[in-house]
Regions:
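A substrate-engagement module of RecA-like helicase motors
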Residues: 10-17, 23, 29-57, 106-238, ...
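Conserved pre-motif I regulatory segment
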Residues: 37-84
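Walker A/P-loop NTP-binding motif
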Residues: 74-75, 94-107, 124-128
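Walker A/P-loop
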Residues: 79-97
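Signature of the SF2 helicase/ATPase Hel1-core->accessory helical subdomain module
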Residues: 103, 116-119, 123, 127, ...
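A contiguous, basic/glycine-rich beta-loop/short-helix subdomain that forms a polymer-engagement track
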Residues: 205-240, 249-262, 369-513, 520-527, ...
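Conserved RecA-like P-loop NTPase helicase motor core
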Residues: 510-520, 570-675
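Conserved helicase motor "Helicase C" RecA-like lobe of SF1/SF2 P-loop NTPases
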Residues: 545-569
Length: 708
């Protein structure tokens, strides 16, 4: 969810839509000359057997679908059109869009779903194409790789800390020494270079270059700033590789700033490729929303205190203002409904009737803090940033509590997992780790329909967009993704996978298991999971739609399997994946974070078991609001939204298994509603052409050559 400086006010959407675009334009030429060796030949000569790619890369295999997709992308760029492409796993979609991008002679942003895919593009795919296009090494592609601002060091913050140390504990002192030494040598300021720095480092949060603490061009380190340097590299590049979070954070900042020239970090660009485009609705919704929390209140008062201590600007008046925000915030958030997790805040009006004085008192305390900061006689530039943050919190709090915007759902999320079981307790965000053990409370405002915003703020401003993923189509069409994203006019293409799914994979659905929603399901499902794992000799992901189901079945199987059992929550995701890869016959039990973006090739992963059709939790406030809006508009939310969303998630989960031509294995779905319910046909028709069975003996036969 967007936070201070990362989102734009939903209240301003209509005004923003009326204005001309100042952040995208029809065509931005390449900063260098078009790549003539690429532009001088038809695409077929690159991809064909005996073509340029196969000559430079002996392991390259011709894939007709890859050529087909590449031609479609080239046409979209040439004809200034939008394009939606589902490219099955193994298509080679990154090369399929990279080559026409290079040939186009235009500046193009490539936005990916994950940092891992960014790294693959920048460190593997682009260099491979470069070697093929320029075998003599006489030319270089102009490419840059950008992450979110919080990945980069703020030199000013580091130097301020050097002058006025505010460190807590030996660990922070060690981290400070490592960062200070690294700052002298790094060219990028990217924290990924600091392998020894923990992901949840509290010190890094004090030193990162996030937008809400940035002084911009008024900063004395502006010229040497790593963000400034990143902007320069991007402005000089033809291909800019980002991730969806950075792209939409940047877009929301530009919308909020009304096109101010120094807003955001991405340069003007008329063409964008969205890889892993099935994630766009959720991510865009987060950045087009608002989040106000007790954590943000605490961070504001803490940052004000640190500045005043450093600059010796403390006055009794401002000390009182800080204390007032703290006390009023603590009281206000303690009065909010005490439900756990995510829940709709439908009782805002009743809440304000009962607690209006406390709400107004918190607003007034934020106003007073901003006013006291403005009254300081000597104001370093940081004061203006802090004043803006106080004012922004005040306005956002009023919006979340008072707005009647019909396209917005208002809800509350409690994080901190007080009293939660171990696996849940470890799934904390970096914000929560900074705040300690207490519960953090987030007041959220999220757009119900992202499509309207994207239609007006993005698609209508771009010359060309290409949306691609292995999981975009539902039932052989793109109606769902087009409607959810507001992309009314786009060419469509489905490229079949290069894999022979019918011989490489078998899909097994147990015919007699109870409904997954019943209490009897877990015990019987555990028995089926055990038998399947014995057939496959482990080597499996067992994926769940809930932590509770995962924990129950894991506990039932403990001591019954001879294979190493790994469970999400017992270690960081990266450590679990590495242990899975190096442990023969391991079984990994996981939830949503293992359903996508995970790649384990070869026999080590020979089985993926999914507990149930992955329908979104109907009580989730955002899901419930979208369902209500569709039904109120005369639609059928179950078939128009809930089923298609679950289809795409299921395709993602099953997509973990077959990652190469040599992979082979079992897909098991422990939910026979796919066979018994009318809507099950939509799932079946959307999946690849796996061999299918309800007979477990067929599974044994499939693995017959492997079973000793």
């Amino acid at each position: 969810m967007a936070t201070s400086g990362d989102g734009f006010f939903l209240l301003k959407v209509v005004d923003e839509l009326r204005g001309p675009s100042r952040y995208y334009r029809d065509s931005v030429p390449s900063s260098s000359h078009p790549v003539s060796p690429a532009a001088g030949f038809p695409l077929y000569q690159f991809f064909a057997p005996g073509g340029l790619l196969s000559k430079k890369h002996p392991a390259y295999e011709f894939r007709r679908g890859q050529l087909q997709m590449s031609q479609a992308v080239e046409e979209a760029l040439e004809e200034k059109r939008h394009l939606i492409v589902e490219a099955g796993t193994g298509t080679g979609k990154t090369l399929a869009y990279l080559l026409p991008v290079i040939r186009s002679g235009k500046r193009v942003i490539i936005s990916t779903g994950t940092k891992n895919l960014q790294e693959q593009l920048f460190f593997k795919d682009v260099p491979a194409l470069e070697r093929a296009l320029f075998p003599e090494g006489d030319r270089k592609l102009s490419v840059c790789y950008m992450k979110g601002r919080n990945n980069y060091l703020c030199r000013k913050k580091l130097f301020d800390l050097t002058d006025q140390p505010v460190l807590s504990g030996l660990e922070e002192i060690e981290h400070y020494r490592a960062i200070a030494a690294w700052e002298k040598t790094t060219q990028t300021g990217d924290r990924a270079e600091l392998a020894e720095l923990p992901e949840a480092s509290a010190l890094w949060y004090k030193l990162d270059a996030r937008a809400d603490t940035c002084l911009g061009q008024k900063c004395k380190e502006w010229e040497r700033c790593f963000i400034t340097e990143m902007r320069r590299r991007a402005a000089e590049s033809d291909i800019i590789i980002v991730n969806h979070h950075l792209f939409f954070a940047d877009l929301s900042i530009k919308l909020e700033a009304d096109g101010a020239p120094d807003a955001g970090v991405l340069p003007e660009c008329g063409s964008v490729i969205f890889d892993e485009a099935h994630e766009l609705e959720e991510i865009a919704g987060n950045y087009f929303g608002i989040s106000v929390s007790n954590l943000r209140m605490d961070e504001l008062t803490r940052d004000v205190e640190h500045l005043l201590q450093r600059e010796k600007l403390y006055t009794p008046q401002i000390s009182g203002a800080i204390q007032s925000v703290r006390e009023r915030s603590q009281l206000f958030f303690s009065l909010l409904p005490a439900n756990e997790g995510r829940f709709a805040f439908d009782s805002r009006r009743e809440f304000l009737e009962e607690n209006g004085e406390e709400f107004l008192a918190l607003n007034q305390s934020l106003y007073r803090l901003g006013a006291e900061l403005e009254q300081l006689p000597q104001k370093p530039e940081e004061v203006f940033t802090l004043t803006r943050r106080a004012q922004q919190l005040q306005v956002q709090l009023r919006f979340v509590m008072e707005s009647e915007d019909p396209n917005t759902v208002f809800w509350i999320e409690r994080r901190g997992f007080r009293g939660a079981p171990g696996a849940l307790a470890r799934q904390k965000s970096s914000e929560e780790k900074r705040a300690g053990a207490r519960t953090n409370i987030f007041l959220q405002a999220t757009p119900i329909e992202v499509g309207q915003i994207l239609r007006e703020c993005l698609w209508s401003k771009l010359e060309t967009s290409v949306l691609t993923s292995a999981t975009l189509a539902v039932g052989g069409g793109f109606d769902y993704i087009r409607q959810r994203l507001g992309l009314d006019h786009a060419r469509e293409l489905i490229v079949a996978s290069h894999f022979d799914y019918e011989s490489q994979a078998i899909l097994y659905v147990p015919p007699d298991l109870p409904d997954p929603r019943t209490p009897q399901f877990a015990a019987e499902a555990a028995g089926i999971v055990r038998r399947l794992l014995e057939i496959t000799r482990g080597r499996a992901f067992v994926l769940f739609t809930s932590y509770a189901q995962m924990n129950e079945i894991f506990e039932r199987l403990l001591g019954q399997l001879k294979f190493s059992m790994l469970k999400q929550g017992d270690a960081p995701k990266s450590a679990l994946l590495e242990e899975f890869r190096v442990t023969p016959n391991a079984v990994l039990f996981g939830t949503s974070s293992f359903w996508q973006g995970v790649d384990v090739q070869g026999q080590q992963l020979s089985c993926v078991i999914i507990d149930r059709l992955p329908f979104a939790v109907p009580s989730d406030p955002v899901v419930a609001a979208r369902v209500k809006a569709i039904d109120a508009g005369g639609g059928n939310a179950f078939f128009e939204y809930q089923v298609p969303s679950a289809v795409i998630t299921l395709k993602q989960g099953f997509g973990r298994l077959i990652r190469s031509l040599h992979d082979r294995g079992l897909l098991a779905l422990l939910d026979n509603r796919i066979l018994k319910k009318q809507y099950g046909r939509v799932f079946v028709e959307s999946l690849p052409n796996y061999a299918k069975t309800t007979d477990i003996k067929k599974v044994e036969e499939f693995f017959g050559a492997d079973v000793g």
